[in-house]
A protein has these predicted regions:
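Coiled-coil dimerization/phosphotransfer module
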Residues: 1-167
């Protein structure tokens, strides 16, 4: 085997897994459907499925009991999906940590990685769309991504009916 063949094989395997996940997500979006795991089991199982498909290992900590309001579940799922996808595509990270907790009438999300940082709301449509969606629901989103030090994305989404109707 030529030098570096094992590393290349691992990278190709990761790329194939990532592309398969993206194609599945695109199919669901094109049909206007939520991921099956989200519709059937709620946020925890859906994020578990997302983590298993990720090209970068995901340490998942979900502190949510029962179902959240649909708007909050969908927004939380897509916020995590966007952050994990960006990590896999741009960060050169070796790990991602996803923390989700619902308490005090809000859901808190934190997605952090050990990548190269440099993420910015001004670059690319994914983060801009995510920011717009979170703010349209009355939520808050913060991005800390200094070059060379990884990225931390914090999202707070309200669970009350008034903010949900802002959609």
């Amino acid at each position: 085997m030529p030098p570096g063949a094992d590393e290349l094989a691992q990278r190709l395997e990761g790329a194939v897994t990532e592309v398969a996940g993206v194609l599945e997500d695109l199919g669901e979006i094109a049909r206007g459907l939520h991921p099956a795991a989200l519709s059937e089991g709620g946020l925890g199982p859906a994020l578990g499925a997302l983590a298993r498909r990720s090209a970068v290992p995901v340490d998942l900590d979900v502190q949510v009991t029962g179902r959240l309001p649909e708007t909050a579940e969908v927004a939380a799922y897509y916020a995590v999906a966007e952050a994990v996808t960006n990590t896999a595509k741009h960060a050169r990270a070796s790990a991602v940590k996803v923390e989700v907790a619902a308490r005090d009438r809000v859901v808190h999300l934190r997605v952090s990685d050990d990548g190269r940082g440099g993420a910015d709301f001004g670059r690319g449509s994914g983060l801009v769309g995510l920011k717009d969606r979170v703010e349209a629901l009355g939520g808050r989103i913060l991005l800390d991504s200094p070059p060379g030090s990884g990225t931390v994305l914090d999202v707070v989404l309200p669970l009350d009916a008034q903010a949900q109707s802002a959609r």
